[in-house]
Amino acid sequence: MRTMYCGEVTEAVLGQEIQLVGWINKQRDLGGVIFLDMRDRAGIVQVFFDADTPIATALATTVRNEFCIQIKGLVRARPEGQVNKDMTTGGIEILGLELEILNRSEPLPLDSNQQNSEEQRLRYRYLDLRRPEMAKRMQFRAKVSSFVRRFLDDQDFLDVETPILTKATPEGARDYLVPSRTHKGKFFALPQSPQLFKQLLMMSGMDRYYQIVKCFRDEDLRADRQPEFTQIDIETSFMNADQVMEISEEMIVKLFKEMLNVDLGNFPKMTYAEALRRFGSDKPDLRIDFELYDVADLMKDVEFNVFSGPANDPDSRVAVICVPGGAKLSRKNIDEYGKFVTIYGAKGLAWMKVNEVAKGLEGVQSPVAKFLNEEIVTELLIRTGAKDGDIILFGADKSNIVSEAIGALRLKVAQDLGLVKDQWKPLWVIDFPMFEPLDDGGLTPLHHPFTAPIGLTVEELEANPVGAISNAYDMVLNGCELGGGSVRIHKQDMQAAIFRILKISDEEAEDKFGFLLEALKYGAPPHAGLAFGLDRLVMLMTGTSSIRDVIAFPKTASAACPLTNAPSFANPAVLAELNVAVVADPKKVISE
């Protein structure tokens, strides 16, 4: 039906007769000469019909936007002065010889000026995907997947599929459950990741595994979260953490070079503790020049308990950021930032405008300046590198609250004031704690319970689990976690110890992980791996703000599909066959 794509018609085929198929992007009638902007997934080309083809021209007057058509025409150079440099096909046009309407279109339910809500776009996703920018994102994603496969194939990784119907295991989020018809009262779970199966593949001698795989998590959604998402999943045997990071970094560097012509350079490594101390986040955005500074030593003796209290508490922190040019912020702006930090548990926000550094205490403006002496202010200005016109923002509370609140404030203020540099800043974050405390006094793994500790015996780990550092690593780019992984536990006694630390009884461990504990008995090799979020990676590379823009048929923020009206109620007969009943008040049933 066609000899080439619309977006591929260039001066190279001048004078040739070609056939194209696609959709009408725009129709213009200029006094008997009909111009059609014809679109397919490759781009747009201009076709015109004139008096030399009266039948086709008459038909061209009847077409409207989104009619699906086929044309035969002659490729010509555009007249001088009519070249459109904004189009890849802007140097040519096609003299239409024949026109066939393959299918007509009713008026679109989407606004042609693209003033559509996300709900509308998802309801008519098949129309939304016709938009050139959406088509380009889908093509870009396909090329990223293709590159990843080629790279890993060349590195002798095996593409091995793992089960979708599997066993529910605790991995941090709720599982999507699938009732079994043949095993009454039992359920499969959709995998949150192929974690255990890829470890079993290493125990099977596969050596190097990868998979571009769907994963499922029943959790609250954000702009970068979906109930079903795609991972680039990797696992290796006989590689240490540095080797896994090296090969993963090489893949991402080459991907950015091929797809965006961007040189990412080498990735620096930063410990988890340093990232929290300097940036208040375990995924720091290095495009922002200013960072957090600890000033508790300056505030221990001030007569202002908001500062001196946390300054004298070993579990608390007093930290500041110095925002370049921030003195121009109004009191209203500052109050809004004060409300913002309360989201993260902070009680408020103290501030200090730097009018004239050379004057020390006299050169600053702040409600808390009266509690500070000349020596403290001078050291504060030196430590933060403050300049005239800056503003210093304070956080004083429990360490985790200050890090999270001031770290988030750093990002927000930088975005609001245009202080985020237009560049790519990658890094590795390493040396994460093995565990984090729960409110009930227990512990939970910071990553997952299959991550190995660094340099500890079983006895040493059980004696002080809170102090254990995991052999884990996250790749971060521009404040976004691209992927994460770890060296895995490959000895049964260490894995059993982790379960004990997590208060998982022997019976529960056998029920949920018996197959893993059994497999670890039979010469399991040292192994390590990681997984990248493909959706998030493509989102970053295409410069959009939501992974819904790079997924063909995504869910809404409420985990629903407006296009198909999923989820939907099931037929009672089907539920009966599955031995499943729907209850009006599940909380009441659970309590009973």
From Swiss-Prot:
Enzyme class, spelled out: ligase
Binding, ATP: R217, D218, E219, Q226, E481, G533, L534, D535, R536
UniProt-listed Pfam families: GAD, tRNA-synt_2, tRNA_anti-codon
GO CC annotation: cytoplasm
Binding site for L-aspartate: E171, R217, H447, R488
One Gene Ontology biological process: aspartyl-tRNA aminoacylation
Alphabetical list of InterPro entries matching this protein: Aa-tRNA-synt_II, aa-tRNA-synth_II, aa-tRNA-synth_II/BPL/LPL, Asp-tRNA-ligase_1, Asp-tRNA-ligase_1_N, Asp/Asn-tRNA-synth_IIb, AspRS_core, GAD-like_sf
Alphabetized UniProt keyword annotations: Aminoacyl-tRNA synthetase, ATP-binding, Cytoplasm, Ligase, Nucleotide-binding, Protein biosynthesis
Sites annotated Important for tRNA non-discrimination: G81
Swiss-Prot/TrEMBL catalytic activity: tRNA(Asx) + L-aspartate + ATP = L-aspartyl-tRNA(Asx) + AMP + diphosphate
Region (Aspartate): 195-198
Single GO term (MF): ATP binding
SUPFAM superfamilies per record: Class II aaRS and biotin synthetases, GAD domain-like, Nucleic acid-binding proteins
Gene3D superfamilies: Bira Bifunctional Protein, Domain 2 (3.30.930.10), GAD-like domain (3.30.1360.30), Nucleic acid-binding proteins (2.40.50.140)
EC number, UniProt record: 6.1.1.23
Superkingdom to which the source organism belongs: Bacteria
Disulphide bond pairs: none
Record's subcellular location: Cytoplasm
The keyword Membrane is assigned to this record: no
Function: Aspartyl-tRNA synthetase with relaxed tRNA specificity since it is able to aspartylate not only its cognate tRNA(Asp) but also tRNA(Asn). Reaction proceeds in two steps: L-aspartate is first activated by ATP to form Asp-AMP and then transferred to the acceptor end of tRNA(Asp/Asn).
Subunit structure comment from the entry: Homodimer.
Record-stated family: Belongs to the class-II aminoacyl-tRNA synthetase family. Type 1 subfamily.
The protein, known as: Aspartate--tRNA(Asp/Asn) ligase
Species for this entry: Psychromonas ingrahamii (strain DSM 17664 / CCUG 51855 / 37)
Lineage of producing organism: Bacteria, Pseudomonadati, Pseudomonadota, Gammaproteobacteria, Alteromonadales
GN (gene name): aspS
